[in-house]
């Protein structure tokens, strides 16, 4: 018997079996399913011919070669053996079985070479496929190998066992002159579920504790396993078992710093690929996976924890992810904490934070709070939770509170507070904040990290309407500094171009403009919270290209064009009476004018007067109801963007001549006006020319939004830092806009 348990037949036994079973007459010539036939040779005896033998005989007869399938004579039977590469008839069940045989022939005088064979496991057979029989000899003139095809094995059961494919190569005609080693019939088999079946077998060995070659000891628990399986999924075990360390040869390995149940779960995962994730065990499992270097398990555990994030646990998950080196999980948990800080500070985890972790929260610009007062009260709540031990950390933590941005009433109360009056460092911080409020003209000299507002406290930047590729944008976008993203916030009631926008009580007031056919005097109010529009009383004058701003409560509509002429008139809207009234007119008619409020005065900058662009600037004093001329800008500008920052007025971009003038240029110049000295100074230019650019202050930086560069309506935005005198590219709008009105709402 062979090692596989199947019976091996010698050549004589095969011949006797064939002769006994097939030596009977058959009336038919044989078909694909009808078995073989008996043919009479020249000596008058009969022998059986199967379909494959018949084809082989005909092929050899065409070549003038006597077939070796004919019954050999007694003189040659002892020195010959049959050989084939065909489908052999199985007398046990009447099916044709593929037999692949590599015929090998040595050089003359070297004797007969043993045939190479490929065996297939066929589930319906009880005996191994009978190999082909080789009759090498000088009487063989040639042999045609049967063409074999790819046959899927459809005999597999529902379990998947025995699934696979047989791949057979095409045979070639071989003659005595050909090299029999170079022409062969080969078959290739690939089991579809081989790896799965193998690991199932290994799992059964694990359950029965068979062939285990290592025992992992953790605590009082011993876990048997197979080194090969563990090292195939874990880089930790692979390094241990393949390196020159003592554990590589030890049968028992002690594991430290790992939960026994988590280790057992991961050992089972190595065999099965299955893992159960539970909220109460996920941290132990993730810690073990990080130690054993199982990146796939680490990833799924991290995603599971991301789904569990809540204001009551996000601080703990963030700290745990940081300790385990799970960078992505830590980032997600940190972002969640920053976004939901208002709910986080109400939970027990916040009160239990160590001082080192708390200071990271207090120092962050990204905490989503409405004002600095919220962060200050959170610190005081944390200190009072364990006042005796935490008072020593108070001065260190108070330095991360932006005290200059607190209301002066709170600062006055802190000076004599029991927690602060005996702490010298706290007193210094409080005094610094008071100076910031008492000396506003010196604030530019007092800039520090404590005077920089947090991103969430500066409000939201809105871009309304403007000219786009569709001849007029009707969408409203808003920009969140904390996330650095633009999203659509609403829609206008209709198309408006060259209009103005002001903000009162966190509402947008859209004033004047033109709709493409006529100049408008209409006014509408948009509430971002309810996303509703309200119609307000119209202006007395139709205006497009006007400037709009808020000065000490009322809205001012300055200059513009009424469809016939350039205007120098100015109207003021009182939010209490909801009426428009005229105030003093400007010295010069101005359209596409830039306006801004600074130090209780209304400034009107540049613009066009009908013949040229203007460099002049004048300001309006509401207390005297008069306009006064100021020092002119260095450049003439129409379509200029204007905003104020730290007591200075900035003029940004624009054009220096009407578009009809072939010498017209679009500008990237930026100028700064100091009202104390009545002088203009050139500062860092924009990264590109921007005409009809929208400019406003957000936090401690100026933002230049959209515009026109001569070819494209721009969707880009850049911010200017007065401290570094540099422009920085920021997130882009969703669409390009020129002449968009940009404003900031503190509480969107």
UniProtKB/Swiss-Prot annotation:
Keywords: Actin-binding, Cytoplasm, Cytoskeleton, Kelch repeat, Repeat. Kelch repeats lie at residues 460-506, 507-553, 555-600, 601-647, 649-700, 701-747. GO terms for molecular function: actin binding; ubiquitin-like ligase-substrate adaptor activity. Residues 72-88 have a biased composition (Low complexity). Residues 51-66, 167-182 have a biased composition (Polar residues). SMART domains: BACK, BTB, Kelch. The keyword Cytoplasm applies. The keyword Repeat applies. One of its GO terms (cellular component) is Cul3-RING ubiquitin ligase complex. InterPro entries: BACK (IPR011705), BTB/POZ_dom (IPR000210), Kelch-typ_b-propeller (IPR015915), Kelch_1 (IPR006652), SKP1/BTB/POZ_sf (IPR011333). One of its GO terms (biological process) is proteasome-mediated ubiquitin-dependent protein catabolic process. It comes from the Eukaryota. Its main location: cytoplasm. Residues 212-279 form the BTB domain. Pfam families: BACK, BTB, Kelch_1. It is found in: Cytoplasm, Cytoskeleton. Highly expressed in brain. Residues 22-93, 151-182 are annotated as: Disordered. Transmembrane segments: none annotated. May play a role in organizing the actin cytoskeleton of the brain cells. This is Kelch-like protein 1. It comes from Homo sapiens. The lineage of its organism: Eukaryota, Metazoa, Chordata, Craniata, Vertebrata. The gene is KLHL1.
């Amino acid at each position: 018997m062979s090692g596989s348990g199947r019976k091996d037949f010698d050549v004589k036994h095969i011949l006797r079996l064939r002769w006994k079973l097939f030596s009977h007459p058959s009336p038919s010539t044989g078909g694909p399913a009808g078995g073989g036939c008996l043919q009479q040779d020249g000596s008058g005896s009969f022998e059986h011919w199967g379909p494959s033998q018949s084809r082989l005989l005909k092929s050899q007869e065409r070549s003038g070669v006597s077939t070796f399938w004919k019954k050999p004579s007694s003189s040659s039977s002892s020195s010959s053996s049959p050989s084939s590469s065909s489908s052999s008839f199985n007398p046990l069940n009447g099916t044709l079985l593929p037999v692949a045989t590599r015929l090998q022939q040595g050089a003359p005088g070297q004797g007969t070479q043993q045939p190479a064979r490929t065996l297939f496991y066929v589930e319906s057979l009880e005996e191994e496929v009978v190999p082909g029989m080789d009759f090498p000899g000088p009487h063989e003139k040639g042999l045609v190998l049967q063409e074999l095809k790819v046959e899927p094995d459809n005999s597999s059961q529902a379990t998947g066992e025995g699934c696979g494919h047989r791949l057979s190569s095409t045979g070639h005609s071989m003659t005595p002159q050909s090299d029999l080693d170079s022409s062969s019939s080969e078959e290739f088999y690939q089991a579809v579920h081989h790896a799965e079946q193998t690991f199932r077998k290994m799992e059964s060995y694990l359950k029965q504790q068979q062939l285990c070659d290592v025992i992992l000891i953790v605590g009082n628990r011993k876990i048997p396993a197979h080194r090969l399986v563990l090292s195939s999924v874990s880089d930790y075990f692979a390094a241990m078992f393949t390196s020159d360390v003592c554990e590589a040869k030890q049968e028992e390995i002690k594991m430290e710093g790992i939960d026994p149940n988590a280790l057992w779960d991961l050992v089972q995962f190595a065999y099965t690929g299955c893992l159960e994730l539970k909220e109460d065990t996920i941290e132990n499992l993730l810690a073990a996976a990080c130690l054993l270097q199982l990146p796939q398990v680490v990833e799924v555990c991290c995603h599971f924890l991301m789904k569990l994030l809540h204001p009551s646990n996000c601080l703990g998950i963030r700290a745990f992810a940081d300790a385990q080196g799970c960078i992505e999980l830590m980032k997600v948990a940190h972002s969640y904490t920053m976004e939901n800080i208002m709910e986080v500070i109400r939970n027990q985890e916040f009160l239990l934070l160590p001082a080192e972790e708390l200071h990271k929260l207090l120092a962050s610009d990204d905490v989503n709070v409405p004002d600095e007062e919220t962060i200050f009260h959170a610190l005081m709540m944390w200190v009072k939770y364990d006042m005796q031990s935490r008072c020593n950390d108070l001065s260190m933590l108070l330095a991360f509170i932006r005290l200059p941005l607190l209301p002066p009433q709170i600062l006055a109360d802190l000076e004599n507070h029991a927690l602060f009056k005996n702490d010298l460092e706290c007193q210094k911080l409080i005094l610094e904040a008071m100076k910031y409020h008492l000396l506003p003209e010196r604030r530019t000299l007092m800039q520090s990290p404590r005077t920089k507002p947090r991103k969430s406290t500066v409000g939201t930047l809105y871009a309304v309407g403007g000219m786009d590729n569709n001849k007029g944008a009707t969408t409203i976008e808003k920009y969140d500094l904390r996330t650095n993203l633009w999203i659509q916030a609403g829609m206008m009631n209709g198309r408006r171009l060259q209009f103005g926008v002001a903000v009162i009580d966190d509402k947008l007031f859209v004033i004047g403009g033109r709709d493409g056919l006529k100049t408008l005097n209409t006014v509408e109010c948009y509430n971002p919270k309810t996303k509703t529009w309200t119609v307000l009383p119209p202006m007395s004058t139709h205006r497009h290209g006007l400037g709009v701003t808020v000065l000490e409560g009322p809205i001012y509509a300055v200059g513009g064009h009424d469809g016939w002429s350039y205007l120098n008139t100015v109207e003021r809207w009182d939010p209490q009476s909801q009426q428009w009234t005229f105030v003093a007119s400007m010295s010069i008619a101005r359209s596409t004018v830039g306006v801004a409020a600074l130090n209780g005065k209304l400034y009107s900058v540049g613009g066009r007067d009908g013949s040229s662009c203007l460099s002049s600037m004048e300001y309006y004093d509401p207390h005297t109801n008069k306009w006064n001329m100021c020092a002119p800008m260095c450049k003439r500008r129409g379509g200029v963007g204007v905003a104020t920052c730290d007591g200075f007025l900035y003029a940004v971009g624009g054009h220096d001549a009407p578009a009809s003038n072939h010498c017209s240029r679009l500008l990237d110049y930026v100028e700064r006006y100091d009202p104390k000295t009545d002088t203009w100074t050139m500062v860092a230019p924009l990264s590109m020319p921007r005409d009809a650019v929208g400019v406003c202050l957000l936090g401690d930086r100026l933002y230049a939004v959209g515009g026109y560069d001569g070819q494209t309506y721009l969707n880009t935005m850049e911010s200017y830092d007065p401290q570094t005198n540099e422009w920085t590219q920021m997130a882009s709008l969703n669409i390009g806009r020129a002449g968009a009105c940009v404003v900031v709402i503190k509480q969107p």
